[in-house]
């Protein structure tokens, strides 16, 4: 059990904050990241120890893409991955986020005799899949809450699907949570124990669109949910950081977690991103927060009015900051590029974001938007208020109705 006195320090690191009273390190000195999918290997991928010893083993330098038999993306040519921005035929842009957008809010399924969760920190991993590639349901199940977050090993997990978010749950099957290293890496997710790797059967493959998955572990009654967006290569989307970019400060989540409240959002941020979504850009969020903040991150986005989309935290207990955050985010962008997916717009607030966006080759540079941060090295665009973007985004072409 970690000492309670260390919680505030852990939370500050978890949310990517620099130590209070210190200045941020210069992330522009970090090494550039290749756009190959394996680049996430440089970031640590271990979870909190599960044996109570307090000694979590490092797993850096492990490959981070699954072998072909376990979900290697079908599209590997980065030269074909530029985002589509319009269709001269007058048809909607392939993969655009068009109405009607499903609410994906049907009441979750239950099992006979199911009891309330005792922990509430188990989590699913949202995914973008390109049509035709293997589709995996990924998650992690833990017990005992924070700060223990102990892996559930050998638990039976029931996997339910709400196809097209139509409100009808169907059980796809069951799987068993792993122990450390049991399963090969899939979609960059290394097996740190308590993991779910469930490949959707070919005859149940998800069509283009948005789908919701809900999982229930039947011994601790922990649950987890996730979204899957199936899109064509080149689908238009945006990616935003969270802490300091959408929240009102880099440190806010740390203190709000301890006080059991949610951070405030920067004024007009939700309106700006909602405008992009209304123009057909699929929402996405990549944060260097620790994985156990998955649910709070989703709650923040929903409560503060941000458009719902694919959301990724790190895969580690401590989260990442500085160079580690840049490496993590660069690896996430590399995996997307390998699928043929490159964001049309990105939003950040730190030098680690600037480095990751440059490694991801996001073009044009003025689509790299930084909130109250000047990207002097790579030429991204500074804004001091999201209100500056509203008129511009209002005038963007509608990818659903060109």
Regions found by a protein language model. Give the residues of each.
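Asp-based phosphoryl-transfer active-site loop
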Residues: 236-251, 357
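Short beta-strand elements
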Residues: 221-242, 255-257
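Beta-strand-enriched, solvent-exposed domains that form extended recognition/catalytic surfaces
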Residues: 91-231
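Histidine-anchored nucleotide/phosphate-binding helix
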Residues: 267-277
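Sec-dependent bacterial lipoprotein signal peptides
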Residues: 1-13
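Conserved beta-strand/loop elements of the cytosolic catalytic core of P-type E1-E2 ATPases, chiefly
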Residues: 263-265
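Ser/Thr-rich, Pro/Gly/Ala-heavy low-complexity intrinsically disordered linkers and tails
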Residues: 14-98
């Amino acid at each position: 059990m970690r000492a309670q006195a260390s919680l505030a320090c852990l939370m500050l690191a978890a949310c990517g904050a620099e130590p209070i009273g210190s200045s941020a390190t210069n992330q522009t000195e970090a090494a550039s990241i290749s756009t190959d999918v394996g680049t996430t290997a440089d970031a640590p991928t271990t979870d909190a120890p599960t044996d109570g010893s307090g000694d979590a083993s490092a797993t850096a330098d492990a490959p981070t893409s699954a072998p072909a038999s376990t979900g290697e993306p079908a599209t590997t040519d980065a030269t074909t991955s530029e985002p589509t921005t319009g269709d001269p035929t007058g048809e909607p842009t392939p993969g655009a986020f068009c109405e009607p957008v499903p609410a994906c809010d049907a009441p979750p399924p239950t099992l006979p005799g199911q009891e309330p969760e005792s922990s509430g920190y188990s989590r699913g991993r949202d995914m973008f899949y390109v049509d035709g590639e293997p589709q995996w349901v990924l998650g992690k199940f833990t017990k005992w809450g924070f700060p223990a977050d102990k892996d559930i090993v050998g638990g039976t997990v029931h996997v339910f699907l709400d196809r097209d978010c139509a409100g009808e749950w169907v059980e796809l099957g069951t799987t068993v949570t792993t122990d450390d290293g049991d399963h090969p890496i899939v979609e960059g997710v290394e097996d740190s124990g308590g993991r779910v790797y469930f490949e959707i059967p070919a005859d149940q493959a998800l069509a283009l669109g948005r789908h919701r998955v809900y999982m229930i572990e039947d011994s601790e009654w922990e649950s987890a949910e996730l979204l899957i967006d199936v899109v064509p290569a080149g689908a238009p989307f945006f990616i935003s950081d969270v802490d300091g970019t959408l929240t009102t400060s880099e440190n806010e989540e740390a203190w709000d977690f301890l006080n059991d409240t949610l951070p405030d959002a920067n004024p007009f941020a939700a309106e700006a991103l909602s405008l992009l979504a209304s123009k057909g850009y699929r929402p996405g969020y990549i944060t260097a927060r620790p994985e156990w903040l998955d649910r709070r991150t989703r709650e923040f986005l929903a409560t503060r009015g941000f458009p719902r989309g694919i959301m990724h935290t790190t895969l580690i207990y401590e989260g990442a900051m500085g160079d580690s955050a840049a490496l993590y985010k660069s690896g996430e962008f590399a995996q997307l590029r390998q699928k043929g997916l490159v964001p049309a717009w990105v939003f950040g607030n730190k030098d680690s974001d600037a480095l990751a966006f440059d490694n991801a080759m996001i073009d044009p540079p003025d689509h790299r938007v930084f909130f109250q941060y000047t990207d002097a090295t790579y030429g991204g665009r500074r804004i001091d208020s999201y209100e500056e973007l509203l008129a511009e985004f209002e005038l963007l072409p509608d990818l659903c109705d060109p």
